[in-house]
């Protein structure tokens, strides 16, 4: 089976800042959320955990799997989508002409990333490569956990559940520290 979870809360989540690949840590609420998730999901079997190398995901994985003999493998392809010069921007949704708003409001039409932001094609390519690589493990019956991020997780969900239909990209966003079984 394949499971996916989003990291715990950070100060930037609370402040509504665009995190992207900026390496922020969990805040105390995020650590509490991860501890609660560890208790809630303690009886779910995982053979291996693949995790974004960004600190907020690493912290979540370590807390979530503390005391369990589950290897954590960090993979750059699981980093959050990059938002370039817009990372750190507060309340970007309230800025009408902010170019990354298209990604959040109408992802099917996010075709011209600006300011060094990552394209959806790039995001889908790297997460697709990752999924192809772990496919033999899934076929062998391994239970795999992915610890990631909002947009990165959505790219995997969109590929598996919606055949890359970009109109459905945000249909099943995962709240912080909530687990979803994908297959």
What do the predicted segments below correspond to?
Residues 42-45, 134-142:
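Glycine-rich phosphate-binding loop signature in dinucleotide/nucleotide-binding domains
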Residues 2, 142-150:
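Generic beta-sheet signal
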Residues 51-52, 125, 147-148:
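Short beta-strand scaffold positions
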Residues 161-183:
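Domain-level recognition of soluble alpha/beta enzyme cores
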Residues 63, 155-159:
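Active-site signature of alpha/beta-hydrolase-fold catalytic machinery across serine-
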Residues 67-126:
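Phosphate-handling substructures
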Residues 5, 9-70:
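Active-site-proximal alpha-helix that buttresses catalytic centers in soluble enzyme cores
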Residues 10, 152-153:
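Short active-site segment of divalent metal-dependent hydrolases/proteases
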């Amino acid at each position: 089976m394949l499971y996916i979870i989003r990291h715990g809360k950070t100060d930037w989540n609370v402040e509504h800042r665009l995190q992207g690949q900026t390496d922020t840590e969990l805040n105390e609420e995020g650590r509490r959320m991860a501890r609660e998730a560890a208790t809630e999901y303690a009886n779910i079997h995982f053979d291996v955990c693949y995790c974004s190398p960004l600190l907020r995901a690493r912290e979540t994985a370590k807390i979530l799997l503390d005391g369990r003999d589950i290897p954590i493998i960090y993979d750059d392809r699981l980093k959050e989508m990059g938002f370039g010069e817009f990372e750190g921007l507060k309340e970007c949704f309230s800025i009408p002409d902010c170019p990354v708003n298209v990604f959040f409001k109408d992802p099917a039409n996010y075709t011209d990333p600006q300011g060094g932001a990552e394209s959806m094609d790039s995001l889908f390519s790297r997460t697709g490569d990752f999924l192809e690589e772990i496919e033999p493990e899934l076929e062998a019956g391994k239970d795999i956990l992915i610890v990631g991020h909002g947009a990165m997780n959505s790219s995997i969900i969109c590929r598996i559940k919606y055949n890359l239909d970009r109109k459905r990209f945000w249909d099943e966003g995962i709240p912080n520290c909530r687990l979803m079984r994908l297959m």
